[in-house]
Amino acid sequence: MTENTPVPVITVSNLIKQFGRFAALRGVTAEFSGGKLYAILGDNGAGKTTLLRTLAGLNQPSSGHISILGSSKFHDICQQVGYMAHPSLLYDEMSGMENLDYFARLYGITSRERCAEVIRAVGLDPDLVRPVGQYSQGMKQRMSLARALLNNPKILLLDEPFSNVDTHSATEMVRLLARTRDQGKTLFIVTHQASLLEGAADEFVWMESGKIVGRTRELKRPESHGESAGGNLTGGNLK
């Protein structure tokens, strides 16, 4: 690695995740640089969410190696990563502030000002008292993002943040995520609405059958490499 080569924030090597006899990830090897927005694309069953959950420490790899910001320890990874699940993990009967206060305590954060800060950061009002169950889908997604930002992570892993959101709200969410990237965070976004990220994503990462089969700077699906791909693509393999 030369002086001008960016140090990867995430490195995965021969990553395999099996559920019984089914291999959801099949030997993924890749490096990802920091301060970028990566769109993770592919058909249903390609392994996108499994990769995201495994990077977040929610899935134990069957084999292989993950290093996030130089560490492979689960505790260190949890401190550096924010995860936005699909569907969102919010309590409908609680207000947004109550939700964030609850999850903040799980991180050992006792300052309600931190909760208010992340709510404002996603464009919502911390004084909003009605239950989350009465929020629009766009507001719920913003609140889920606020939850992911609570521990001020350097890396955000977002699963379908535009799901069931109207076009205007989705566009506003993209702008918010781009600003978050511009503040120095690294974002990985799984989505089936790739066109929303055209012009915002730094890189499109294409998955197929549990492997990374291509990485492009433009929203153009690479030719399928089939079994020969091996998921072995690093940050330099861009088209």
Sequence positions of predicted segments:
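Conserved ABC transporter NBD signature motif
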Residues: G64-I77
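H-loop/switch region of ABC-family ATPase nucleotide-binding domains
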Residues: T191-H192
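The feature captures the beta-strand-to-loop junction immediately N-terminal to the Walker
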Residues: L41-D43
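Helix-to-loop junction immediately C-terminal to a conserved catalytic motif
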Residues: A56
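Catalytic Walker B motif of ABC-type/P-loop ATPase nucleotide-binding domains
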Residues: L156-D159
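Conserved ABC ATPase "signature" region
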Residues: D101, R112-D127
